[in-house]
Amino acid sequence: MSEVYFHNYRIDPDTRYFLYIGELKNYGLNIFLKDALSRLNNCPYDFIAIVPDILEQYDYANVAVINPVARENFLNIKRKYSCRVPGPTFMQAVSKSPHVIKLIKDLLTRQAQVYIYMYESYREMTLDDMDGVSILGPSSRVANRLNNKIYQYENFQDVAPIPEFKVCRGLDALQAATEELWPVWTDGIFVTTAYSAAGTNSVIAHNWTDISSKFKTGDYVYLISRYRPHQYDPTVLAVVANTSDVYVAGVADQRIEGGNRFTGSTYPSVLPPELQSELYTLTRRVGCRLAEEGYRGIFGCDYIIDDQNRILFVEVNARKQGTTLEFCCTLEQLLPPGVPMLPELEYHAVVANRFPENTREPAVGLEGAIYWGTYNLKLAEDACVAGFMPFCGDERQCFGLAAREKVSRQFVILEHIGNDFVIAAGSFLGRIVALGQDHRSVQQGLAQGKKMLEATIARSWQTTAQTVAAKAVE
């Protein structure tokens, strides 16, 4: 397995290119960006996607695959192997890749500038040190600081309603603090490290065993907060251009399993308009604070609504959210033709510190909303795939069909890894997007898609995975 697992890009001499560097699930965002850049620059633009996703086949144009972790495991076990790679590790590998560096140099012989577009800005991305290369997104230094949950809770108390919290340095301090708080925070204690997403490095604890089984080392600084029983986990997607201009795309409801594990979202939110309006207002305030800190671009805010209908801040994600592509597809159908979509708004925020004059924000509780939901099937343990899932269609096209009422319900399965792969725990087997005329039809589509995905996992996957692991030791 070479440094580049797969590539199929072809350079058109009459086209300018930017690079997308990130996971394949956000590939579709770049189509919106290339359309905007083509129009704004009055010349054809396209993109080349550098992704870490190891799949059996790629029904995507202009892709190059680099995954240093999968490459190392493939060399050890001599089997097709797929795994997620941490963002910093991936960005570092891409930044040092001779293949990518040569690609950029080749592009710079034909165009004056190469943009790099990412899902999240990482400090490990250093390709913009090259002359003529720039990041089309937030500053990585600023994003890293703002994504620190401890920094958020300590510095955003005057901006958003933050739960009661404490900061603990090391396991001993964590144990001492929680011993005092168990009798007071009787519904549980949420424990997380400074950087955690989708349930990793976090736990809702009701005793010390819950914590010690999750965290094996004392090297972390921990944030603990009072857990509040709640029914709703709304997430708000937005773009900030400056300290007074924050665009809110809308509110979706997150699906949280096991108390802290994010598996997808549904839209439109079931929350009443007055609560959604409050979420809009809070998110604008958070966005203005982000701008004061130097952040420009797409971001998301997660909240909970407790049993007394009080809104509590959970976190801000100084990056694109998992719902960004779905919101682009939704807004394209609901807003007037020609208004800028989220990637174009981010472009103007980064380059010009403002939004274009024809920006149009959706109203709260927009009439005629498209119903959709997503489900990310992440594996809790190593597995083997013994089934094939063909490419199921274009997500953007499906939203168009739903908006024109050409279909009453539909779901697509995306990024299925493929047949005869060893898949590492923590990897996505695939992603489901369902559309319908109401929430019920969306849930039916998600359930059916999940069954189809799960059917591709080998029944004897535990034995198979153990055999493969044993071979790696031999």
What is each stretch, according to the model?
Residues G137-V142, Y267-V270, L325-L334:
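Short helix/strand-bridging catalytic loops that position acidic/His residues to coordinate divalent metals
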Residues M1-R141, D172-A176, Q448-G449, I457-W461:
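ATP-binding N-terminal substructure of ATP-dependent carboxylate-amine bond-forming enzymes
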Residues N62-A64, K80-V85, K149-N155, T178-P183, ...:
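Short, surface-exposed amphipathic charged segments that create phosphate/polyanion-binding patches used
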Residues N201-Q308:
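Internal nucleotide-binding/catalytic subdomain
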Residues D129-N201:
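A conserved helix-loop-beta module that forms one wall/lid of the active-site cleft
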Residues S121-R123, R141-A143, L171-D172, A194-A198, ...:
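Short acidic/polar capping segments at secondary-structure boundaries
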Residues R255-R261, E274-E474:
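ATP-dependent carboxylate activation and anion-phosphoryl transfer catalytic cores
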Residues H7-I11, E154-F156, V191-T193, G418-A424:
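Short, flexible, solvent-exposed loop/turn segments with mixed acidic/basic and small polar residues
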